[in-house]
Design a protein with these regions (language model features):
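Non-catalytic C-terminal accessory region of glycerolipid acyltransferases
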Residues: 2-13, 20, 152-269
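Membrane-anchoring hydrophobic helices of lipid-metabolizing enzymes
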Residues: 2-96
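Short glycine/serine/threonine/alanine-rich loop segments
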Residues: 80, 141, 197
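Residue-level detector of flexible, active-site-proximal loop/helix-junction positions
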Residues: 89, 127, 148, 206-208, ...
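A generic structural signal for well-ordered alpha-helical segments
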Residues: 74-75, 136, 159, 192
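Short gly/ser/thr-rich secondary-structure transition/capping motifs
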Residues: 77-85, 148-149, 211-214
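Short amphipathic alpha-helical segments and helix-helix/interface helices
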Residues: 71, 111, 132-133, 155, ...
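Catalytic core of membrane glycerolipid acyltransferases/transacylases, capturing the structured
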Residues: 42-65, 77, 92-147
Length: 269
């Protein structure tokens, strides 16, 4: 019995070390991939056309396939599994505001890998990070500087004819471990009212919980974590607000309703 227990402990330890190593390898590969896209692929895309719109579309395609490849690599390494409910609603989404909760570090990677083309909001840290600034700037992603200009940039992007949908996480940061949802920042609601485009809710759950806010990447679970993505039907702003004119009151009301909606939907899981 003691030998069996010892063998089980050794196996458990080896499994943990494998997961830590595989996770570290995955994120190192992600960083190297960012440098490669910024230093090699992006310049080639720039040479392929003088049209800024085409450059952005092609860079977004490169990022989409890179993120899809990264997700599949993590699956092959046994780190994670995932499944999608309602993929067809997201895959070819156009001129929608796609909003999702944010439980893990890899949410944006998984979602962009699923969308044929996507515009995205990025933080200053990603905008200036040497590993990521090349790809995100070349792709025409929008810098979230917390200013009026940021809102205007998002609205302009969404109102462009046949524009790719805009992906945004209203929580603004990953959900704290043990919490269902952070408070929503008002940017998404503000953009939705001003652009007057459909809102596409996406629910993300991760079991067991990992890669949350303030959690070290090497604090890996004892088993593969599973990400479930559920894409819901689009919501029209007019269905949520009696008066959809732009005003601080309407922004607050829409923000509250969206947060309440996500809370209710996530509580069902």
């Amino acid at each position: 019995m003691a030998k069996m227990l010892k063998a089980a402990q050794i196996k458990q330890k080896a499994n943990y070390l494998w997961r830590v190593g595989a996770t570290g390898f995955s994120f190192a590969s992600f960083g190297i991939g960012g440098v490669a896209i910024g230093g090699l692929v992006a310049p080639l895309v720039n040479l392929s056309t003088r049209n800024p719109s085409l450059r952005q579309q092609r860079t977004q395609k490169v990022i989409k396939h890179s993120f899809k490849g990264f997700t599949e690599m993590m699956v092959k390494l046994g780190i994670m599994t995932y499944d999608i409910e309602g993929l067809e609603k997201l895959q070819h989404s156009k001129q929608e505001l796609v909003i999702a909760n944010h439980p893990t570090l890899v949410d944006v990677v998984v979602l962009i890998g699923l969308m044929e083309q996507a515009n995205c909001v990025v933080k200053q840290a990603l905008w200036s990070n040497p590993f990521t600034k090349g790809p995100v700037q070349n792709a025409g992603y929008i810098l979230n500087a917390g200013s009026e200009q940021f809102i205007q940039d998002c609205v302009k992007k969404l109102k462009t004819d046949q524009a790719a949908s805009l992906l945004i996480f209203p929580e603004g940061t990953r959900t704290a471990k043990g919490e269902l949802l952070n408070e929503f920042q008002r940017g998404a609601a503000n953009i939705a009212i001003r652009a007057h485009v459909p809102i596409r809710p996406v629910l993300i759950t991760c079991t067991p919980s990992t890669l949350t806010k303030n959690e070290k990447w090497y604090h890996v679970p004892s088993q593969s974590f599973h990400i479930h993505v559920k894409v819901l039907d689009a919501i029209q702003v007019d269905d949520l607000l009696e008066d959809a004119t732009v005003s601080p009151k309407n922004v607050r009301q829409l923000n509250h309703q969206l947060h309440q909606f996500f809370n209710q939907e996530l509580s069902k899981k």
